[in-house]
Amino acid sequence: MNNSLWQQCAERLQSELPLQQFNTWIRPLQAKLNGETLTLFAPNIYSVDWVRDKYLKTINTYLEALCDDKVPNVVLKVGEASPTQRDSGSPQRAAATRRKTPNFSSGNTDVEVPFESNIHPEYTFDNFVEGKSNQLARAAAIQVAENPGGVYNPLFVYGGTGLGKTHLLHAVGNGIMAHKKDAKVFYIRAERFVQDMVNSIRNSSTNEFKRYYRSVDALLIDDIHFFANKKGSQEEFFHTFNALLEGNQQIIMTSDLYPKEIDGVEDRLKSRFGWGLTIAIEPPELETRVAILMRKADERGLHMPHEVAFFIAKRLRSNVRELEGALNRVVANVQLTGRPITIDFVREALRDLIAAQEKLVTIDNIQKTVAEYYNIKLADILSKRRSRSVARPRQLAMALAKELTNHSLPEIGDAFGGRDHTTVLHACRKIQELKDAQHDIKEDYRNLIRTLSS
């Protein structure tokens, strides 16, 4: 057995299964072969159960045919295989694991050997669905891919969970390597940087660790907020950051938070995060959510009527990951029942998700959350007062109600002290103008959405 075992098995599954089934259930799996155990990591428990029930017997049959000696025991888990242990999850992922990374935990620190980029080839700019919520971040990322080490260095992308930040990082990596085949592009999570640093200290290989991280052409580091309250890691990254910038090597970072909002990180590091370009990815607006669903369904070989995509997108609003989870459930129900995809079918398949979302976000909840955020009374939100300290939060609350609930403009107006629909429409347009022009309003709106969607 070797590290191509799962890749060979996945290739056989790809040749036997319908494309829709393979893309939905097999392609997302990541594998770790450890002795006589082959662990398959799935994105969620629903996928684990489905693969176990529908495909495990076939997987075992293929493994028996591929193995000359003892067949590994297959274990299904929720999670991800670590990059250094990951087997090729599908034929398309083999290219992403062709390079070897120094193992600082074992003292193997030869920085001259080829390294693992950790870049997933399937994440590109072409399949990143663009909308108003992310178009600036995508445009900046494309500029970096075409001109690494240029004016947008460092690039700091922030936004809530599941909005596409990691996709953009991999797309940049693929773009850089497309322009320069031998580019040394390295994607990691901040947690991995911390682990490598700790291992290098334990094994007296800190010099090798420093040379390795400072030798890359582009460092793409995800979830930079993980450095919070880790002073040693912050100190090392501070010097790594400076060395890379001095060498015109590209740095791209992502975080759930705006740099200045990351508690537990030194001010000098926060300041450096903003030296280049800091840009937000917002929760996708309705049109983008529809486009994402249509694209993802098409990738799975599934025809989704536009009105069905609109129905789902109108009710599930928080992030792309939530939409993908809903789509996976729809696909599974289609395969299980053979029924056509209609609004009634989707309403039944997603009834618990929709009910949870509608229970979570109500106009009343929005009003209370906005009042608390701005430290004003709920009665002020509902009053006729027109002072800016009250009028602006009221307009924000109206705009949030339009975006996060299914209520009509007249219904929203009625909930805000009997105002008419034109007042609500004006508030929504005004807030959009302010979001485009004023960073603080944009941040307030983003923070409120995050609070209401959590």
From Swiss-Prot:
GO terms for biological process: DNA replication initiation; regulation of DNA replication. The keyword Nucleotide-binding applies. Residues 79-110 are annotated as: Disordered. SUPFAM superfamilies: P-loop containing nucleoside triphosphate hydrolases (SSF52540), TrpR-like (SSF48295). GO terms for molecular function: ATP binding; ATP hydrolysis activity; DNA replication origin binding; lipid binding. ATP binds at G162, G164, K165, T166. GO terms for cellular component: cytoplasm; plasma membrane. Residues 82-91 have a biased composition (Polar residues). Its main location: cytoplasm. InterPro entries: AAA+_ATPase, Chromosome_initiator_DnaA, Chromosome_initiator_DnaA-like, Chromosome_initiator_DnaA_CS, DnaA_C, DnaA_dom, DnaA_N_dom, DnaA_N_sf. Residues 81-117 are annotated as: Domain II. CDD domains: AAA (cd00009), Bac_DnaA_C (cd06571). PROSITE patterns: DNAA. Pfam families: Bac_DnaA, Bac_DnaA_C, DnaA_N, Hda_lid. Residues 335-454 are annotated as: Domain IV, binds dsDNA. HAMAP family: DnaA_bact (MF_00377). Belongs to the DnaA family. Plays an essential role in the initiation and regulation of chromosomal replication. ATP-DnaA binds to the origin of replication (oriC) to initiate formation of the DNA replication initiation complex once per cell cycle. Binds the DnaA box (a 9 base pair repeat at the origin) and separates the double-stranded (ds)DNA. Forms a right-handed helical filament on oriC DNA; dsDNA binds to the exterior of the filament while single-stranded (ss)DNA is stabiized in the filament's interior. Oligomerizes as a right-handed, spiral filament on DNA at oriC. Domain I is involved in oligomerization and binding regulators, domain II is flexibile and of varying length in different bacteria, domain III forms the AAA+ region, while domain IV binds dsDNA. This is Chromosomal replication initiator protein DnaA.
